[in-house]
């Protein structure tokens, strides 16, 4: 099953975010099922020095990925490990902080988390206000998608950012 999270809820006219403990749980789930993650980093962007020891070289065609937003950004890959989790949770506190908007944030952009076979497990497109889980059988993301503005969408193709059309998705039932 695939899932999508939107930054806005049309039913309640509210902005939606994944932050605090919900954000840390999302990262824990991504780290559980992923081996590598990638981000777009522009020169002098925050975290580039802290993440450098965990950077890996990857053949460009080994992983599915989205194109950059600008010519100055480069795709960097990092191995998943506890030290990286702590770097990410110490510096970034919300899913929408994965952006370099020139104002509040100077962070790496568009994180993708990849399984050991190179397929995408999770991606965040902060510029367009959407996050995606591409789950397989046995991958439990219920601790994340049971909270917030998540929708199921079995028709999400891997690594293609769909036009968010509400009729393609159905609201998930929230657990109390």
Model-derived segments and their meaning:
Residues 1-176:
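Structured alpha/beta or helical-core interaction and ligand-binding surfaces enriched in interleaved
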